[in-house]
Amino acid sequence: MSDQQQPKQINFTILPDEDSTAPRTYANFCSIAHTPFDFTLTFCEVMPLSDKEIKEAEAEHVVRAPVRTKIVVPVQFVPNLIAALQEHWRVFSDS
C-alpha cells in the first residue's frame, strides 16, 4: 500500500485584471434574493420621479427601477463579501 500524497496548498492573492473597456455600472438600489446554492444581487438605478410617476407610485405603491446588472455568487462567497464590505465601511467611516 503506498502513501497517498497530501494535496499541496498554494497561497495566492487574486487581483482584478483591469480592462479599460470593461463597463462601470452605477446603481443606487440593490435587491437581494437567495437559493440554497447562491445569492443574487440585482442592482438598479432609481431616478427622480416625474409628477406622473409619483401619482402612479402613490396609487400602486410601487416604483419601477431599471435593472443595471445582476450578479450571482455562491453561498460560500457571501461571508467574505460581507467581511470585505464591513472593513471598507470601517475605513470609510474612520476617515
Cite the ranges covered by each PLM segment.
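N-terminal intrinsically disordered, cationic/polar leader segments
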Residues: S2-Q76, N80-S95
